[in-house]
């Protein structure tokens, strides 16, 4: 019986050789099937197998592209699981913990990178590198409050909140996002934010992906955030930073190392927490995300998976028929990625998701409260740590209130199936049947440390306008 089983589970010598370079101990059968499928494709190309073995056996040496034909949807199916080919083979031979194509970037030597949309796609794992989180420069907080109260932006912030429409504006991805680089949507005249970097700092850096989004690579990492010139910087061992940004505050006084206290960004244990709501009722406990890839879906997975928040498990005695019906349509929900200091939301549900992210809206030049519709199979960058760092570095020079206002940027609201805003009959997110609130811990903790260093506000913050 054993001999019969081994007869039907025969592995070719070529597959065995390639599996010798496999990384990690998990998913042996899946990896074997993935390699077997690849060998069948490569055997049709002269020298392809040899080139792959050369790349795997000599990681530090130059190697050529190893290509396979691109499928219609760009994905490859291995044992009932579909994935992007370069991600699959990078996972097998280099990074077993790889979660998403957002984590990979092709090397310059690669002639057939996945993102180039050519008929052939390179699967050489040594033609890709893993995206690293950029190091954010510390925020320099003045030790003494030399800021002129007349320059306070508190009035502007209050005007902005007063001028906010009763209902948020709406934008649909990707239709509303194709704006000329030199003409973003106008901000409110009282907007506390500088012009959108989508049009100024790095105009050719798309922050989102089209309907084929799971098969597109993100843009290059944007330039570092603004820092004062070297002779104004606080610690002697600080790294030199780009000072060419056109977003430098014009009224910033000259500061010396004795006058400022640097506050550094620290990556928290849990990068975010997610809270689920039905109408205006919070349901269940908060989900704390430690994995950089998190699924929020409508199913019931009792296994307590740390990278999955199953809304189907949560009960609510006040649930009405509209909520029940909406929950049935959440399906695969949304996939959240935290990669290289950026947060992406990919809609896996058959129904659209609706996102209100002030950071995303700032980048695209939308009004801060705009709600963006993300259709099924699309992904959108909803937060960028480096843009946030730029805003924080500038806000420090405008006082406590300006920094405190940035807390709104660290919370992202997202509804499933049903939208809200000017184009929908629901005016507020609390009128949607099923929605989540995402709190970004890293930026929030950074703000907290900066505010603590700044001391008390010039004008007490209150709920009274």
Curated annotation (Swiss-Prot):
Effect listed in the UniProt record for changing residue 80 to A: Exhibits impaired binding affinity to GC-BRE DNA sequence
N-acetylthreonine, modified sites: 2
One BP annotation, GO: stem cell differentiation
Phosphoserine PTM positions: 463, 465
Composition skew (Polar residues), residue ranges: 169-182, 237-251
Residues given in the record as Zn(2+) binding sites: 65, 110, 122, 127
Tissue distribution: Predominantly expressed in mesenchyme and somites during embryogenesis, and present in many tissues of the adult.
UniProt keyword annotations, A-Z: Acetylation, Angiogenesis, Cytoplasm, Developmental protein, Differentiation, DNA-binding, Metal-binding, Mitochondrion, Nucleus, Phosphoprotein, Transcription, Transcription regulation, Zinc
Protein known as: Mothers against decapentaplegic homolog 5
Organism of derivation: Mus musculus
């Amino acid at each position: 019986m054993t001999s019969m089983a081994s007869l039907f589970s025969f592995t070719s010598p070529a597959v065995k050789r390639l599996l010798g370079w496999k990384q990690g101990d998990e998913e042996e059968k899946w990896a074997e099937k993935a390699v077997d499928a690849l060998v069948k494709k490569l055997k049709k190309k002269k020298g392809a197998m040899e080139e792959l073995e050369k790349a795997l056996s000599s990681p530090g040496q130059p190697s050529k592209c190893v290509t396979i034909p691109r499928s219609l949807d760009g994905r490859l199916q291995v044992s009932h699981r579909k994935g992007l080919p370069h991600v699959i083979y990078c996972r097998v031979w280099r990074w077993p913990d790889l979660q998403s194509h957002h984590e990979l970037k092709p090397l310059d030597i690669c002639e057939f990178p996945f993102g180039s949309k050519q008929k052939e796609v390179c699967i050489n794992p040594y033609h890709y590198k893993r995206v690293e989180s950029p190091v954010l420069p510390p925020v320099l907080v003045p030790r003494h409050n030399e800021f002129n109260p007349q320059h306070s932006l508190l009035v502007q912030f209050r005007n902005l909140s007063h001028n906010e429409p009763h209902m948020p504006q709406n934008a649909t991805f990707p239709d509303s996002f194709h704006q000329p680089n030199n003409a973003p949507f106008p901000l409110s005249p009282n907007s506390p934010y500088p012009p959108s970097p989508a049009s100024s700092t790095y105009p050719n850096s798309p922050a989102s992906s089209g309907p084929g989004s799971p098969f597109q690579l993100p843009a290059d990492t944007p330039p570092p955030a603004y820092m004062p010139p070297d002779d104004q910087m606080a610690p002697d061992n600080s790294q030199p930073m780009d000072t060419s940004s056109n977003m430098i505050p014009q009224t910033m006084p000259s500061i010396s190392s004795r006058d400022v206290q640097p506050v550094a960004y620290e990556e928290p244990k849990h990068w975010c927490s997610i809270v689920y709501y039905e109408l205006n009722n919070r349901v269940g406990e908060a989900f704390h995300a430690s994995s950089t890839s998190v699924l929020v879906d409508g199913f019931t997975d009792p296994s307590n998976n740390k990278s999955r928040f199953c809304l189907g498990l949560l009960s609510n005695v006040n649930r009405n028929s509209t909520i029940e019906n909406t929950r049935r349509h959440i399906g695969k929900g949304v996939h959240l990625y935290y990669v290289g200091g950026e947060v992406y939301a990919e809609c896996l549900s058959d129904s659209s998701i609706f996102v209100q992210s002030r950071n995303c809206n700032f980048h695209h030049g939308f009004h801060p409260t705009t709600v963006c519709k993300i259709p099924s199979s699309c992904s959108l960058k909803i937060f960028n740590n480096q843009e946030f760092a730029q805003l924080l570095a500038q806000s420090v020079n405008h006082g406590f209130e300006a920094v405190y206002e940035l807390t709104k940027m660290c919370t992202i609201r997202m509804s499933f199936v049903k939208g809200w805003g000017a184009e929908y009959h629901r005016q507020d997110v609390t009128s949607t049947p099923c929605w989540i609130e995402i709190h970004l811990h890293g930026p929030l903790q950074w703000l907290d440390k900066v505010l603590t260093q700044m001391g008390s506000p010039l004008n007490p913050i209150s709920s009274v306008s």
